[in-house]
Amino acid sequence: MCIRDRSIRAIISAPPGPVVPDGYDPARRAYFQQIGGYGFAIGAPESIEVKTTTISECYRRGLVRFRYGLASRIRAKSPEQTAGLQAALLTGVRSYIPQEQTDALRVAGLAHVLAISGLHMGLLAGGSYFMATLLLAMIAPLSRRYDVRKPAAIIGALAATGYLLLSGASVATQRAYIMAIIVFLAVILDRRAFSMRSVAVAALITLMFHPEALISVGFQMSFAAVAALVVVYREWHDKRGYVPRIGFRQKSWSWLSTLTVTSFVAGTATSGFAVLHFHRVANYSLLGNLFAMPIFTFLVMPAALAALIALPFGLEAIPLAVMGWGLSLLLKVSVWVATWPGAILHVWAAPAWIIGLLGLAFLLATLGQGLRRYLGFGLAALCFMIWSQTPRPDMRISDAGQVAFWDNKDEAILYVGRKRSDRYGREQFMQKAGLVNGEIKRYQDELAQCDKLACRFEVRGKQVSVVHHPSEVPLECDTADIVILTKRQAGPVARRGCAAKLLDERVFRTAGAHDVYIEDGAIELRPANKKGRRERPWS
């Protein structure tokens, strides 16, 4: 017996499905995380003895407790403004970051700072490697007889392993860790460290343990960035050949140009996948990274490494203060960039299959040579052309029969039945349409003709009836194009005799919420819980 589990009275329900078609699916994520349900407690927890706990479970829970305890210690010793960010960068616990800081970093194109990935792993493990190399090189008898880079690579690998465990081992962190280990192995074996073969091995190992990560935004963006950087810098290195010794001014210019190229290449490689998943573009991302990355690279992460080294000795206060000062500068940069006009552009969602086509285009552009590379760029351009012609949904019908639709004349106005209901689903619908700042009004106040039994209004030339009682369904079916019954089922007779599109409790229970597209007089209903999803084990 290594731990005490706890018993608690709670109300638990199955993980919910997507609230919009092709939207984020919490049930799928919960399935692969082995989470059977979500809920909330209705009583105080009680400790119980559990004798069936495995060694691996003991280790996992102990590590979680250690991480959260360390996060609390770091927050207590850090400046108040940046304490949450410092805990997130050192332990992966992001729940203490204020929302306004997250929003500012996202708008400035610096959200990647929050996710522990290749940048963080490279700086921390690489910093450990170079520091170990320097210290070992100072030992003259050792450096004269042996290649000190190899034991330094082992130290770097150990530092990377410790950071992986400490940070929570997300998929992006695992990818970065695998790449770091491959690089250190290459140093030990006197091989080329950075190559597309290394990227492919890292991808295969990641997918071997987490095959579900293939369609996740973290996997796609992290591998897109590292693959593009490897290709660009490998070709740059091969073409420039011998580089003569240069002075400080030339070195400064070379460093600035390298930082610019790195930010541009990584940003360009990941932009398509980021927009596909998040439906927004940070217009000043390149400038934000040019201003912020020197602070993060040369101040924040070295101080973070020093803080981790000093933690066992209780000497972390000074490194954490330096780290906090650097992060405060970075936050000032992000807030400054976020206030520029047009800093964020919201775009509407693309069809789900576009991401597969864009992935193929990216592979051709990075792995191909000559004509195949140009074919990849052309295919990417085709993806964006198709995307630009994709229609927005005209109306949303939640799984409880709540309706939201755009004004026929002004798409900046969204009409709803009740402002307080279906908030999350409505936000996802607005984000999918690329109109997150739309004004919300009640259709009962302006457009609809309502009585005790139903509300009737027009959307893009089609008559819609929101019915509150099954007895009214036959009458509304004769005059409306879409009939929505908010309570109970319509019954088999009414369903067969209805010429309109009829949605009732039976449809909502099976197919969930719906997006409605009206194009050239035709009505298309797209359910959130599609037939293909209903056949999945997490449905």
Regions found by a protein language model. Give the residues of each.
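Membrane-interface helix/helix-cap signal primarily in integral membrane proteins
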Residues: 4-112, 488-501, 505-538
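Membrane-interface segments at or immediately adjacent to transmembrane helices
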Residues: 7-9, 389-456
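Divalent metal-coordination and catalytic microenvironments
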Residues: 10, 89, 117, 168, ...
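Hydrophobic alpha-helical transmembrane segments in multi-pass membrane proteins
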Residues: 39, 93, 97-285, 347-392
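Short acidic-glycine loop/turn motifs at beta-strand connectors
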Residues: 43, 407-412, 460, 519-520
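Membrane-interface amphipathic/re-entrant loop segments adjacent to transmembrane helices
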Residues: 47-61, 107, 272-291, 295, ...
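Short amphipathic alpha-helical coupling elements at transmembrane boundaries
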Residues: 72, 88-91, 103, 183-187, ...
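Cytosolic C-terminal regulatory domains/tails of membrane transporters and channels
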Residues: 430-539
